[in-house]
Swiss-Prot record:
Name recorded for this polypeptide: Dolichyl-diphosphooligosaccharide--protein glycosyltransferase 48 kDa subunit
Topology feature Cytoplasmic, residues: 427-445
Gene: ostb-1
Pfam families linked to this entry: OST48_MD (PF23358), OST48_N (PF03345)
Keywords: Endoplasmic reticulum, Membrane, Signal, Transmembrane, Transmembrane helix
Topology, Lumenal side: 21-405
Record's subcellular location: Endoplasmic reticulum membrane
Organism: Caenorhabditis elegans
Length: 445
């Protein structure tokens, strides 16, 4: 039996590894392990299994026998033109449709492959060779003179702590690369980091002067989206944003208010990857219950109109690898047939949200519907279908107070009919004496 503890240890290790998320990291060369080692190690330290490959590796694949081989895909290969193996932009779209999450980091030397991936998801990178330039917010130490190494302030970040972390404490972020724009019809697009109002996209090596294609805050430095199946994708125009150089650098902006501060690239990269890998902003429904007021279980025969009901739902949020009660106070319940007949905000008591209300005086098939959509969170959707019936004849009130005048008129009519009948049937007329004398005289004649 000496082998039993060892066997249990091996089994526990295998079980732990099976729970770890599998990440495929693609670089232009194997050098990405060195140039981005701090970033990759930070992801590995959070319990993920990383597989680093060249983007043109002939053995690349995301599916095997119809199943996902990896849970997440990081592309740190800006200049890739064609992926190796079975990998392609359409294959990556299938990966997202299957629930996989993607991080794409481009650069000024962007290739066609990354441009196609962005187009598949409602974004468009600028032309190859262009860079985002800002003459008022660049780093004086790292910049080569083109003013393309930008210092990004906290006011340029999206107001979503789940995605970018605590922006109030975040140091300026260094960015060098290409800009992108979100499609006008892309309703799912998130403008995670915008360029400043003085920035523009241009080719710094262009000999002939032309107007910038995009400028100002319309230029995105980092964009993303959460698809309808809750898969997450992040696009950035700077692979250097995740590099060791930018992680360890101190900002030396032309703006004196942000000089000398340690760059916030490491904290920003941690926050953005935690979000895209669904380590944060994930909700789930634990339990749902609805019943008549004063009872504890749903009625077998369904509900009846105008009954008082209580609806309760328990929601949990994933934080630091553990499911904890969700503390949101803006979750709403709708009681829907075709349109909502009732809409009420649920009261949160440490993750247990509830509301009591009266059913409408309308019969039919209804749904208890919770449809919670907030930036940074996964889409929470729960439906409980119930029937609402009319009252049985024995359930109606014997006398309705509002009908008392009609009751009174009915009873008064019946009483009047009885009195009239008595008078008519039992009243006898008294004969007139004069009439009898006249009758006797007529007989004599």
């Amino acid at each position: 039996m000496r082998w039993l503890p060892g066997l249990l240890l091996i089994a526990s290790i295998g079980f732990h590894q099976s729970l770890a998320d599998r990440v495929l990291v693609l670089g232009e060369t194997a050098a990405v392990k060195d140039t981005h080692s701090v970033f990759l190690n930070s992801v590995k330290e959070r319990g993920h299994e990383l597989t680093v490959r060249a983007a043109d590796d002939s053995q690349l694949a995301l599916f095997k026998h119809g199943q996902l081989i990896f849970d997440h895909l990081f592309i740190l290969a800006p200049g890739v033109q064609v992926f190796g193996g079975s990998l392609s932009p359409s294959e990556i779209s299938k990966f997202v449709d299957a629930g996989g999450n993607v991080l794409v980091a481009a650069g000024s030397n962007i290739g066609d492959a990354l441009r196609e991936i962005a187009a598949e998801h409602g974004f468009e990178f600028e032309e190859a060779g262009t860079s985002v330039i800002d003459h008022h917010n660049y780093d004086q130490t790292l910049d080569s003179g083109d003013h393309t190494t930008l210092v990004v302030g906290k006011d340029q970040l999206i107001s979503a702590e789940l995605i970018v972390g605590n922006s109030a404490k975040l140091h300026p972020v260094l960015f060098k690369g290409i800009g992108l724009v979100a499609g006008k019809t892309n309703n799912l697009a998130l403008s995670i980091v915008r360029a400043s109002g003085t920035a523009y996209s241009y080719d710094p090596k262009a000999v002939r002067a032309t107007n910038p294609s995009i400028a100002g805050s319309r230029t995105l430095l980092v964009g993303g989206l959460q698809s309808r199946n809750n898969a997450r994708i992040v696009f950035t125009g700077s692979s250097e944003l995740f590099s060791n150089t930018f992680f360890s650098a101190k900002t030396n902006s032309v703006n004196p208010s942000v000089q000398g501060a340690q760059s916030g690239n490491a904290d920003f990269a941690t926050a953005i990857t935690r979000w895209v890998m669904k380590e944060s902003g994930v909700l789930r429904v634990k339990t749902v219950n609805h019943h008549k007021k004063g009872e504890t279980v749903p009625p077998v025969e369904g509900y009846f109109i105008t009954e008082d009901v209580v609806y309760t739902i328990e929601i949990e949020e994933l934080k630091n690898g553990k499911w904890v009660p969700f503390q949101g106070k803006d979750v709403q319940l709708e009681f829907v047939r075709i349109d909502p007949f009732v809409r009420a905000t649920l009261k949160n008591s440490n993750g247990r949200l509830s509301v009591a209300f009266k059913l409408p005086d309308v019969l039919g098939v209804f749904k208890f519907l919770v449809d919670y959509r907030r930036v940074g969170y996964t889409h929470l959707y729960d439906v409980q279908q119930v029937s609402v019936r009319p009252l049985w004849h024995t359930q109606y009130e014997r006398f309705i107070r509002s009908a008392y005048p009609y009751y009174a008129s009915s009873f008064s009519m019946m009483a009047g009919l009885v009195l009239f009948s008595i008078v008519y049937l039992y009243h006898k007329d008294t004969p007139v004496k004069g009439a009898k004398v006249l009758d006797s005289e007529k007989k004599k004649n």
